[in-house]
């Protein structure tokens, strides 16, 4: 049976222990201590390693966007652009354990410069066939932009480099970025 370990700081997936013939292997690349995660997430060159990322995963060009004809100005934290937001630095309340881990938090109107009060619910669900499902639910009391992701990094061997590992994505479309990797 697969096992997942999480931190309520940043909703981080810290470990995924996968059963193998040689025993469990941790396939997650992460940090050892909470202080390491805090240092990473507060750094200008943060990897957001293992974290739940938002309010807007990816970059917002020139740190400005419009909703309903109104311009919203964000912190330029990645050159002249805005990257990811502060969800990785939030403390999430753990609501349930077991095969389903439920974590919740709120994001007040104006946090990071975004409109709307958000209620955030993140579920990490471990299925009977050793699959991990991530279910995000967010409600807002105002029109806003939202783009969520999880920033877990994997090494399927559990250690060493990943240069011989292959990833295949079955996607009919993808979003290209400009020279600053902004959509």
Functional labels for PLM-detected ranges:
Residues 2-4:
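Short, small-residue-biased leader/transition segments that mark boundaries at the very start
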Residues 6, 124, 132-140:
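Short, well-ordered beta-strand segments enriched in hydrophobic/aromatic residues
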Residues 7-67:
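Acidic-aromatic substrate-binding/catalytic surfaces of carbohydrate-active enzymes
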Residues 24, 135-164:
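Acidic (Asp/Glu-rich), glycine- and aromatic
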Residues 70-71, 75-129:
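Extended, loop-rich substrate-binding clefts of extracytoplasmic carbohydrate-active enzymes
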Residues 108, 136-143, 169-175:
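Short, solvent-exposed aromatic-acidic interface loops
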Residues 159-183:
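Active-site/ligand-binding surface loops and adjacent short beta/alpha elements
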């Amino acid at each position: 049976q697969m096992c997942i370990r999480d931190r309520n700081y940043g909703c981080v997936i810290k470990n995924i222990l996968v059963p193998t013939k040689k025993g469990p292997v941790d396939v997650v690349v992460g940090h050892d201590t909470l202080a390491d995660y805090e240092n990473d997430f507060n750094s200008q060159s943060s990897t957001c390693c293992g974290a739940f990322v938002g309010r807007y995963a990816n970059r917002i060009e020139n740190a400005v966007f419009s909703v309903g004809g109104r311009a919203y100005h964000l912190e330029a934290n990645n050159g002249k652009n805005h990257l990811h937001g502060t969800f990785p630095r939030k403390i999430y309340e753990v609501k349930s354990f077991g095969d389903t881990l439920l974590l919740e938090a709120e994001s007040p109107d104006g946090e990071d410069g975004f409109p709307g009060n958000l209620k955030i619910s993140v579920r990490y669900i471990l299925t009977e066939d050793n699959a991990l499902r991530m279910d995000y639910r967010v409600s807002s009391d105002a029109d806003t932009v939202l783009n969520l992701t999880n920033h877990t990094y994997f090494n399927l061997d559990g250690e060493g480099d990943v240069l011989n590992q292959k990833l295949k994505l079955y996607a009919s479309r993808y979003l290209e970025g400009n020279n600053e990797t902004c959509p």
